C-alpha cells in the first residue's frame, strides 16, 4: 500500500491566506501560518520539497442558496493560477461556509485572550484548519 501524502488546506483572502496541513497519515489538520498572496507559492514549494503533498483543498465561498458571490470568482482565478504553478498537484474546491466563524469560536474556546485571537492571521490559519478538518471528516473511508 502506497503511503499517503499530506493534504494542504487553503483559506484564500485578498489580503491574507491561511494555510493548514495534515499529518502524513491524513488523520488531523494543523495550522501552518498565514501568508500574503504573493508569498503563498514560495511557501507551498518549500513544503513540497520536504513532504509529499497529494492534494490542496481551497475554500470556496458559497452563499446559503448555493450560488457564488464576488469572492467566488476571485477564488476561481486563484485555483487556476495554483493549478498552473503546480501542475502535478491535485486541487479541489470545498465549501468554506462559516469556517471563519467556526474558527473564531474554536479560538475563543481555547482560552486565548481576545488580544491574541485578534492577531493578524491567527483566524485565517485556523479557518484553513477548519475547512481541512471538514474535508477529512467528509472523506474518511
Curated annotation (Swiss-Prot):
Entry superkingdom: Bacteria
Pfam families xref list: RuvX
Main location class: cytoplasm
Signal peptide from the UniProt entry: none
Keywords from the UniProt entry: Cytoplasm, Hydrolase, Nuclease, Ribosome biogenesis
Gene Ontology, cellular component aspect: cytosol
Classification via Gene3D superfamilies: YqgF/RNase H-like domain
SMART domains documented for this protein: YqgFc
Protein location: Cytoplasm
One example of a Gene Ontology biological process annotation: rRNA 5'-end processing
Similarity comment text for this entry: Belongs to the YqgF nuclease family.
Function as written in the Swiss-Prot or TrEMBL entry: Could be a nuclease involved in processing of the 5'-end of pre-16S rRNA.
Protein name, per record: Putative pre-16S rRNA nuclease
Organism classification: Bacteria, Pseudomonadati, Chlorobiota, Chlorobiia, Chlorobiales
